[in-house]
Amino acid sequence: MAPTNSLLYKNFQKHPAALIESTEGIYLNTSDGRKILDATSGAAVACLGYDNKDVQRAVVEQLVSVPYCHPGFYKTQAAEGLADFLVESTNGLMSKAVLCGSGSEAVEVALKLAKTHFSHLAIPQTERSHFIACVGAWHGATLGALTLGDFKVRKDPFVQLISQNSSRVSACSSYRGQRDGEDDEAYVARLAQELDDEFLRIGPDKVCAFVAETVGGSASGCAMPLKGYFPAIKAVCEKYNALLILDEVMCGMGRTGTLHAWEQEDVVPDILVVGKGLGAGYAPVSAVMINSKLVESFQKSGKGFAHGQTYMAHPQAAAAALKVQQIIRDENMLSHIRSMGAYLGSKLKERLLPMPYVGDIRGRGLFWAVEFVTNKKTKTPFPYDLGLNSLLHSRGMSAGYEIALFNANGGYDGYSGDHFLICPPFIVTKEDVYEIVERTARVVEDTFEELGNSAVWEKITLQMEIDDVEVKPVGAMVAA
């Protein structure tokens, strides 16, 4: 029976053009006979590809034995096993785990855990309800997560529903935020001072936590932290007895070359949020981990965590995630991710960076972004109304290209600033990476060739000529 389009998509006038009928490896097979190369693992999710038999078997076995039981009444071996694995994966630096269903949900749980921690102290600090996040960040689509985020396209329609107990400071972005002539050490010091100033502006006793993506995700396009950034930020948090929450929903669970992205930053969070690649798309699952400091406040207070959801610690999701993580560990995939990631980064820079409208290529592991600008010198973004990122994605999905690129915008000011992510499954080979880069290059070349022959290009080139004389202020990733 053919679909009747009863499913509500984000755009009422459009729906996904391709109906996927089957999958194999890193490819998606459409109903019209095309084979889409998934260069983005969906949204950095399907890290083991689409047909891992061991994970499928683990899900089926769990479905047959214990498909579901109420997480408030019972426990299951699958959920206990996944929580144990997650805690052990941090070498004991994190102490407990909460299992959730999505990244947005996990962020909500992290906020509630942080607030509850301060309420449970021997001398409760109930005034701590303010969260500081980063300009240009994205933490999810639910209302609490939207409070933290700065992706204006998705946030602004709901601003009247969103809590005002949050504020933003500049993110660490060497491409967009670092000043000419400013070395890394000075830039990091400036960002740390900005956070310190924000604590003082809000009132140190009112701030609950600073929340950041360890490596920027879809909104910022893999914004990379400089060496020393997170230790400096953690020092500010500790100075005022606030918590550090790291959101690794997109960049974590091996995506950047270590199981946890913070392992490369010489810092340990108080609360860690993971998702996406945790279950590799074989089940909807995410998790929140807390350190011993939070566990101690709960234990000493003798009070619980006032939170519960129907599908928390879902046994099928836990079984899938546990098997996924065991495969990543047992097959030494982290080494492969680092190797293939280095190759992917070098080939992207070699093939795409010389193109006139590619401003920056950044990333690590199998997590890379390509940002587009009208002018490499001024870094001016393309007009938001042009929808360049959508044009690139649409061409990639069309016949003759057949590659999925994770397109996004907002990296400049929350609206404009076009980029796409390339974050393929961990199972890619060198040949796969080469094919991804070549198809991507053709998409970019042909999209700009077509744009160059269009009427809209005259307006863009006129603005480019102005930019050559008048350097625009750099607005992305910098707090107003």
At which residue positions do the language-model features occur?
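Conserved N-terminal phosphate-binding loop of PLP-dependent enzymes in the Aspartate aminotransferase
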Residues: 1-480
